[in-house]
Structures are given as structure tokens and as C-alpha cells.
């Protein structure tokens, strides 16, 4: 294989590997923004509620929380992150939206 072709091929492989997850991130972020999640949560720092990365760090290693978090989102929560954080119920979200948000948050 010619060196130029090899370099070109090798340099595009990482970009191809990142394309899929980037699209998932954008979709999840847009959904979180559209549904008002960003009014209280941020990606890398606590705002009114805990950051998405802190939520992911706490729960991603526990498979049972992938099933529990939809109930927390839908029903609201208090005390999971101390007395300061109270999340209001988000009952207007569809099952599919809640599942997409849980998957996206846990991927952070």
C-alpha cells in the first residue's frame, strides 16, 4: 500500500468511529434541552440539580438503576443528592423520551 493512502486511511478510521456516538450525544442533548432538563442540570457541573456526568458516574455501574431512573424522572425525587436537590415530576415525557434520556445521561 502506498504511504499516502495508508496515512489517509489510518487518519480517517478514528473519525468514523466517533461519528455514531457524536450523533447520539447531539440527539440526547437536544432532547434534554427541548424537555427542559437543562434548566436545572448541566453536563459537567452542578447547577440547580446534579450534573449529568455526576449522575452517570453514580449510577452507570449499577444495572438496576437503568430500570429505576425512569421512575425517578417521571415521579420526581428528593434526597438522592442531599436536601438541596429536589427534582419535580416530569410526567409529560413519553416512555420513549424517558428511555432515551436515561440512556443518554448514563452515557456521559
Residue ranges and their predicted role:
Residues 1-4:
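Positively charged n-region of N-terminal signal peptides that target proteins for export
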Residues 6-15:
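Bacterial N-terminal signal peptides
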Residues 24, 28, 44, 65, ...:
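Stable alpha-helical elements in mature extracytoplasmic
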Residues 35-44, 101:
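The canonical Cys-X-X-Cys-His
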